[in-house]
């Protein structure tokens, strides 16, 4: 006797939801495990067994119908991709835990999974390669298809894989992107009592295949009583592409050298270097953070090699800049904080990587040839060559070296690093250089560098970077040799706050004071529930003078029941300055939900509104304080605001108000500041423009690598985990700041779709190469959502019959009483319905919906099914 088993199924392809009645029936018919043979008793579903479709395909326990399913593919517990995979019916065999469905893989897909096809051939002559069963080709391989969650788990023995590093993504999955034109812009300005100033930054480019053409420029304008000045700076133009077989990048034009072995310098020429980004996350990673303390609402400017690479307005108190463009984060960063009262802080943040350790067997190289390039008007452009190599050796050792060659300069460096286990990691190197300076004097000397990094996990201490460099009296760098004179200033002109245009020294050099010792430190200490401490700083001293360039910042931060507070102290001094700048600052932020006693409210306007207080004291004994209110508004938290009022013992009362809106087509910020002597307005407008084969799309500020989202007709749909990003009126959007050579999840928020928009699958994944604009396309259906009751000869169609709209290909299934739920349906068309084999088990149901169906959430209609002529 056959054992009756209940049924729950899902048809292959993209099956639209059923009517509520049909869904409740299907949800109840859950499969039960049984040793006996199973079959479906149609009499249970209807007394008239002829009114039930042929359900024999579900009589194999938990077997599902073969076809194409969109599944999440996991290999050895690592996510690979979300893709359409074809499944065929087959007997359950060794390694097959998919319930009778056999996933079909092509040789290309098997390579994508990282299988070593040379050791494990997967295709034979004369054998169908469109459906390869992994367990049959690879001993120990297993596949398991979880139909309920649409997850395909693949287990492969490590011996069968080309690369066992965690996070490895085969180059076959890397996407070079689509042809495109890109513009990234940022426009900031201020209008005050005495002067106006504007700053426009433009990064434009073209993408074609693997090639990226970029130009970076900036325009400065200032105007005061009786003067005005403007200047356009061409910061750089370059062409770049990936050399995938070499895991390298080629750059031609204006760029910077690496800073692994030598200090970074600008050049105009060509560079070929190993790309860390092409390797898994476990093999690389470090980025600089610029910290400081602003006493007032200040303008923050960061320069590198004489060029302005970052400019923004910061609130009083401690700040940390973590979003510098990675392509501009090599070499020392010159930080300028222009305070509201006219005072200025200047200090240098050195940037050096952690010790240069490489895995055993890995070789990293960097070759550069070109003219030295700097934004400093005091320097020339000598031609030079630079080559470095870093090699991972056994026993945790790394050896490295390199050379710099120019007409008036020769340098060679050798060094080694080692992993000390529980003691951290260390590297030591020595550089010998022979230099001819601007006065034609010849010098030679050595420089010894020591770097150390260590995380004391048991104590919460992290020595992110601890370094020291000692140089003999005759040691000079390529940057020193490029100066045209032995000493001098590089000037820019600005307002002195009293309606006069005055020169402002941006940098000073004196080659008679060669660098001697340089110490840098970056330490953090986690105190658990009691907060954290950090110490960052550097000190550079020189031969023949007691002056130093020194900057230190010590800070403590903690929180309690939603309240956050911090105390920080900074000390800075530059060569030629009148004295050291010292600032002590305290900051506190309290959510309104705490002030009102609703401490644990979740995502309400009270949680998003903060009362703030900050106070600071400088070296002159000037005390100042500010209180304010700030927070975020709108559903997506993309409108932020701040209002403050304060007082200074030297400058009286002051205040500010600012707001920033992160919109779909860009970011807009406005602000107002005043004090006893002046007031000013400032604003910032930034965004991106992308031209592609389907038109032009406006966006928020672009990153180096971006994703173009294509969902035709799906307007106003939000992108998950992207503040303020949603599709435009055509269904296009740009997701900025994609991670290169990594899986990027792109998901449409289906809750923001209108009643007539559906998407086959709202999630896609892409793996872009450096600088690419990759397309994430979604198959959208724009049309009517309808429940159509179809009848044949006056009787409902059989339950479980397959339905397909002939023009659009939309599929569904007949539910209870002949009801069919369909979405994305054209106003007029035909439904092809089949419930068994033979011409008598199919029919065609023409339908026509009213125009006002487009205004309804769901339309109810009926149709008569007609058997096709033989």
Curated annotation (Swiss-Prot):
Q: Chief subcellular site? A: membrane
What's one GO MF term for it? fimbrial usher porin activity
Q: InterPro entries per the record?
A: Fimb_usher, Fimbrial_membr_usher_CS, FimD_plug_dom, PapC-like_C, PapC-like_C_sf, PapC_N, PapC_N_sf
Q: Give start-end of the signal peptide.
A: 1-27
Biological process, per Gene Ontology = pilus assembly
Looking at the keywords, is Cell inner membrane present? Answer: no
> Taxonomically, which superkingdom?
Bacteria
Q: Which cysteines are joined by disulfide bonds?
A: 843-865
One Gene Ontology cellular component annotation held by this UniProt entry: cell outer membrane
From the record, what ranges are coiled-coil? none
- Which family is it part of? Belongs to the fimbrial export usher family.
Q: What's this chain's function?
A: Involved in the export and assembly of FimA fimbrial subunits across the outer membrane.
The name this protein goes by in its record:
Outer membrane usher protein FimD
Lineage in the entry? Bacteria, Pseudomonadati, Pseudomonadota, Gammaproteobacteria, Enterobacterales
């Amino acid at each position: 006797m056959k054992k009756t088993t209940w049924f729950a199924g899902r048809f292959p392809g993209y099956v639209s939801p059923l009517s509520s009645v049909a869904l409740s029936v299907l949800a109840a018919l859950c499969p039960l495990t049984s040793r006996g043979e199973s079959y479906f008793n149609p009499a249970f579903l209807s007394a008239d067994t002829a009114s039930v479709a042929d359900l024999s395909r579900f009589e194999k326990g938990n077997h599902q119908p073969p076809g194409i399913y969109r599944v999440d593919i996991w290999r050895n517990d690592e996510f690979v991709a979300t893709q359409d995979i074809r499944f065929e019916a087959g007997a359950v065999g060794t390694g097959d835990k998919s319930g009778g469905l056999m996933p079909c893989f092509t040789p290309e897909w098997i390579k994508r999974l990282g299988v070593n096809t040379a050791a494990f051939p997967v295709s034979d002559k004369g054998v169908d390669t469109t459906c390869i069963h992994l367990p049959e080709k690879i001993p120990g391989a297993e596949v398991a298809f979880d139909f309920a969650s649409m997850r395909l788990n693949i287990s492969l023995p490590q011996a069968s894989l080309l690369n066992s590093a965690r996070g490895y993504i085969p180059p076959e999955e890397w996407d070079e992107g689509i042809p495109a034109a890109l513009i990234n812009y940022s426009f900031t300005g201020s209008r005050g009592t005495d002067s106006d100033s504007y700053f426009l930054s433009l990064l434009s480019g073209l993408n074609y295949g693997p090639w990226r053409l970029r130009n970076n420029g900036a325009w400065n304008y200032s105007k005061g009583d009786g003067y005005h000045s403007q200047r356009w700076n061409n910061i750089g133009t370059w062409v770049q592409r990936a050399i995938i077989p070499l895991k390298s990048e080629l750059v031609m034009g204006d760029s910077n050298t690496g800073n692994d072995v030598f200090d970074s310098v600008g050049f105009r020429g060509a560079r070929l270097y190993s790309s860390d980004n092409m390797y898994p996350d476990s093999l690389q990673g470090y980025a600089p953070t610029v910290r400081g303390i602003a006493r007032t609402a200040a303008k923050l400017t960061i320069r590198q090699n004489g060029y302005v690479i970052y400019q923004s307005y910061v609130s009083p108190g401690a700040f940390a800049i973590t979003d510098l463009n990675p392509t501009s984060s090599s070499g020392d960063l010159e930080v300028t904080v222009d305070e509201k009262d006219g005072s200025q802080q200047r200090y240098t943040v050195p940037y050096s990587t952690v010790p240069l350790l490489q895995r055993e067997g890995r070789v990293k190289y960097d070759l550069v040839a070109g003219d030295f390039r700097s934004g400093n008007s005091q320097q020339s452009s000598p031609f030079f060559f630079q080559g470095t190599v870093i090699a991972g050796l056994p026993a945790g050792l790394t050896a490295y070296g390199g050379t710099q060659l120019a007409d008036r300069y020769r340098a060679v460096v050798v060094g080694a690093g080692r992993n000390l286990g529980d003691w951290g990691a260390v590297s030591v190197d020595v550089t010998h250089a022979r230099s001819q300076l601007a006065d034609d004097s010849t010098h030679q000397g050595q420089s010894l560098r020591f770097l150390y990094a260590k995380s004391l996990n048991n104590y919460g201490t992290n020595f992110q970077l601890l370094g020291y460099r000692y140089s003999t009296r005759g040691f000079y760098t390529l940057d020193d040799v490029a100066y045209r004179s032995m000493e001098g200033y590089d000037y820019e002109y600005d307002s002195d706050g009293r309606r006069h245009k005055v020169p402002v020294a941006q940098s000073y050099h004196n080659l008679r004071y060669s660098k001697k010792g340089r110490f840098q430190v970056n330490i953090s200490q986690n105190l658990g529930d009691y907060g954290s401490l950090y110490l960052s700083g550097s000190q550079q001293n020189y031969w023949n003078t007691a002056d130093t360039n020194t900057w230190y910042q010590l800070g403590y931060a903690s929180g309690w029941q939603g309240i956050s507070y911090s105390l920080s102290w900074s000390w800075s001094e530059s060569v030629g300055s009148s004295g050291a700048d010292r600032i002590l600052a305290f900051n506190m932020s309290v959510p309104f939900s705490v002030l009102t006693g609703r401490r644990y409210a979740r995502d309400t306007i009270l949680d998003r509104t903060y009362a703030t207080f900050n106070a600071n004291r400088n070296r002159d004994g000037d005390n100042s304080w500010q209180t304010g209110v700030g927070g975020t508004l709108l559903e997506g938290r993309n409108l932020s605001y701040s209002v403050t009022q304060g007082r200074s013992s030297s400058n009286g009362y002051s205040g500010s108000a600012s707001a920033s809106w992160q919109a779909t087509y860009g970011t807009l910020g406005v602000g107002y500041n005043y004090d006893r002597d002046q007031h000013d307005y400032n604003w910032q407008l930034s965004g991106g423009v992308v031209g592609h084969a389907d038109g032009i799309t406006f966006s928020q500020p672009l990153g180096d690598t971006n994703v173009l989202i294509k969902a035709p007709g799906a307007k106003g749909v939000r992108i998950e985990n992207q503040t303020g990003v949603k599709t435009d009126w055509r269904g296009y959007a740009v997701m900025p700041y994609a991670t290169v050579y990594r899986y990027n999840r792109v998901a449409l928020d289906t809750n923001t779709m209108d009643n007539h928009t559906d998407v086959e699958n709202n999630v896609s994944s892409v793996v872009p190469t450096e600088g690419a604009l990759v397309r994430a396309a979604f198959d959208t259906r724009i049309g009517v959502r309808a429940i159509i009751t179809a009848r044949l000869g006056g009787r409902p169609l059989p339950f479980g019959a397959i339905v397909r709209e002939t023009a659009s290909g939309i599929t569904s299934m007949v539910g209870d009483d002949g009801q069919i739920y369909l979405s994305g349906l054209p106003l007029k068309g035909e439904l092809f319905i089949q419930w068994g084999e033979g011409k008598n088990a199919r029919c065609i149901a023409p339908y026509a919906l009213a125009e006002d169906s487009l205004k309804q959430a769901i339309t109810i209609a009926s149709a008569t099914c007609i058997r096709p002529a033989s």
